[in-house]
Amino acid sequence: MIFNFLSNFLINNQEILWLFTLLADLSFTLLLYRLFGKAGLQVAIAFSILLANLQGPKLTEIFGLQTSLGVIFYASIFFATDVLSENHGKKEAQKAVQMGFIVSIIMIVMMSLALLYQPTNQPNTAVFSQNIHNAFATIINFTPRFIIGSLLAYYISQRFDVWAFHAIKKKTGEKHLWLRNNASTMSSQ
């Protein structure tokens, strides 16, 4: 009953759902960092880029503007690369960006291979299997085209973000972390 109420509330309040999703994504990133350190941030980046690419084709309206659901997850990617840059250096941040890029390419290849498998035609599951196959094909056939453009934008913007973060750090020293985080992220958008 509470789950139904909450679901209906969020369906009818997309901006609150967006904020909840954003906070959940950033919280999971922090949790992974707290539990696993640098490796946790690398996992968070790879996971967020996968979510961004899989959910990217889904469009919705937030604050009256049409947007892709995938953009929500870029907040945690920028956050994670900034934390990596600050605490582990430019090389580690760039390595995490490259890992996210490669994980997405692997996903495209493996999901494309999965589409080649024919659904079962066993009497008890043939209709279900065909329906799932068709739904899967709808998402996966669109995803590679979406991911290729997204990956290029991701790679360029993240590399620039890491570069800008360290260029600002070189000028300000250890002071003004807020400036490095915000200026590098805003300029790389």
Question: Which residues does each predicted region cover?
Answer:
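Transmembrane alpha-helix boundary signature
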Residues: 54-65, 87, 109-123
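Membrane-interface interhelical connector segments
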Residues: 114-145
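Hydrophobic transmembrane alpha-helices
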Residues: 1-84, 91
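Internal alpha-helical transmembrane segments of multi-pass membrane proteins
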Residues: 171-187
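Transmembrane alpha-helix/helix-exit interface in multi-pass inner-membrane proteins
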Residues: 98, 102-125, 154, 158
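Aromatic-anchored segments of alpha-helical transmembrane domains
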Residues: 48-56, 104-110, 189
